[in-house]
Amino acid sequence: DILAAFRVTPQPGVPPEEAGAAVAAESSTGTWTTVWTDGLTSLDRYKGRCYDIEPVPGEXXXXXXXXXXXXDLFEEGSVTNMFTSXVGNVFGFXXXRALRLEDLRIPPAYTKTFQGPPHGIQVERDKLNKYGRPILGCTIKPKLGLSAKNYGRAVYECLRGGLDFTKDDENVNSQPFMRWRDRFLFCAEAIYKSQAETGEIKGHYLNATAGTCEEMIKRAVFARELGVPIVMHDYLTGGFTANTTLAHYCRDNGLLFHIHRAMHAVIDRQKNHGMHFRVLAKALRMSGGDHVHSGTVVGKLEGERDITLGFVDLLRDDYVEKDRSRGIYFTQDWVSLPGVLPVASGGIHVWHMPALTEIFGDDSVLQFGGGTLGHPWGNRPGAXXNRVALEACVKARNEGRDLAREGNEIIREAAKWSPELAAACEVWKEIKFEFEAMDTI
């Protein structure tokens, strides 16, 4: 069975048991009245069941309801259908004031009907020939307004300076100031030029997101013809059907697949309504993607750190034990579905490098947008600074030093022999983003 953990906030006067049962029924065979066609099927076999209700500590009005829906209610290999069934109608339900899907358990029998990520972590490392460290990326800014040639130039400078990947911003599709084909060509030129000069494999996440599936495949085909290693998709705005289509194309044609989660906060920001990102992350692993953005943890609160690491493990590991302190409501066995690399991006710079290296470990992508391009000397030194900081942190960690305690010291030592890093350290020494975390247990 597929198990779902909901946080239910019933309307005043509605007991939590009734609200939980209503949620389970609406996600399966129930409707608002008894119908004669009920007699034509075995409702006992197909109905959803609410099997557990517990109070949410510290919140009088809400309860955590765990519902089970039989695997036969879902189409094989379709995340779209899974969500339509599990969360389709029930969120507008009159009896519940608010409803949040906290976690799903996907049984191995259902997991096996999905292709999952086109390649996974190990295959990606082998393709890129990069081992033993996180992968470095950078989003090209300003995200809108550059011409294709200048955009390609920015890409080249970053890759030449020492980054592994650069990235199209999620909003860069094919706008009047830069059509997709021109961008693809100039970025491919930047990739090949920087590869030839550095002897490392480089890539640029070419955003193939478009208005129709056919147009997306057309862009992916063009990327494959250019011989570039990776394309990108906005999986929530593009939709799961489009995402799975593109993921299948990527596996068949040897393209890596980077996933951006634009629009996720619309769904996962509220504590009492919507869906937690760990559900969207699980869905992405089934639908297919080699990288997915997953927040940064750095500079925020500890509570959020555990929760973020919870869904990061759900993305990377084969088997994840139930652990309520990290927000994981069910044990999840992925049965050999390839892993997804979590991408840390958003407001990070060289001073965060020790923390990022420690928190995310080697299997991750660290993405610095402004943290590369904001360097006072330009993109290439900015990229060089990030690479030096990363190598210093990995080396220190391998020597057994404590990155959490000695992080700043490690960066300062490295800055002594890298003027680029020293300049970066100077620029970003005071910047902090101090806000309360939304996502606490």
From Swiss-Prot:
GO cellular component: chloroplast
Transmembrane segments: none
Subcellular location: Plastid, Chloroplast
Modified how: The disulfide bond which can form in the large chain dimeric partners within the hexadecamer appears to be associated with oxidative stress and protein turnover.
Domain of life of the organism encoding this protein: Eukaryota
Chief place where the protein resides: plastid
PTM sites of type N6-carboxylysine: K167
Site (Transition state stabilizer): K300
Binding site for substrate: N89, T139, K143, R261, H293, S345
UniProt name for this protein: Ribulose bisphosphate carboxylase large chain
Source organism per UniProt: Viola sororia
